[in-house]
């Protein structure tokens, strides 16, 4: 009888999907390739492509704009997590790309709980090609890695 009562009470509770809102912070770039040509505009476009790809590939994601992040001075982890939390995000995605040569790049991605500050997921990915398509593919791959880790 207790099991029946417990089942009825549990059925009356609102269903939760467990979906977590993910705030994607602006991607940062460390360029150590020493290329002579100034590629700041190309790199900014590619970082935006990466963020937009993640936004389209991750359920319940939102972009936290650079203008919002600029209110954190200095940009401490606590301040950035607070911005994400204030935006309604349960998790914040921090990404740093490192360009080591004209062809080789790495992504360091960390998903952090905005309430506790605990690291949920960390991925270090290598990819080749400093062009729009390579950054887009890297974004899709990272999103897939995040989905698989959450299953």
Predicted regions and their residues:
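Positively charged n-region of N-terminal signal peptides that target proteins for export
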Residues: 1-4
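Cleavable N-terminal signal peptides
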Residues: 6-7, 17
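Hydrophobic alpha-helical transmembrane segments of integral membrane proteins
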Residues: 10-11
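C-terminal/domain-edge helix-coil "capping" segments
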Residues: 19-32, 49-53, 60, 83-86, ...
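Glycine- and acidic-residue-enriched helix-capping/strand-helix junction motifs
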Residues: 35-49
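Short, glycine/charged-enriched secondary-structure capping and boundary segments
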Residues: 37-39, 107-110
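Short, solvent-exposed, polar/charged sequence segments at loop or secondary-structure edges
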Residues: 57-94
């Amino acid at each position: 009888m207790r099991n029946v009562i417990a089942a009825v009470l549990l059925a009356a509770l609102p269903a939760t999907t467990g979906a977590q809102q993910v705030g994607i912070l602006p991607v940062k770039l460390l360029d150590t390739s020493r290329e002579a040509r100034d590629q700041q505009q190309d790199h900014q476009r590619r970082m935006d492509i990466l963020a937009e790809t993640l936004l389209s590939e991750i359920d319940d994601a939102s972009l936290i704009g650079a203008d919002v992040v600029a209110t954190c001075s200095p940009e401490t982890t606590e301040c950035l997590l607070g911005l994400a939390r204030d935006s309604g995000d349960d998790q914040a995605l921090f990404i740093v790309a490192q360009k080591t040569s004209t062809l080789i790049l790495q992504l360091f991605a960390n998903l952090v709980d905005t309430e506790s500050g605990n690291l949920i997921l960390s991925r270090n990915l290598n990819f080749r090609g400093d062009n729009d398509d390579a950054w887009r593919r890297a974004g899709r791959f990272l999103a897939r890695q995040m989905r698989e880790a959450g299953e």
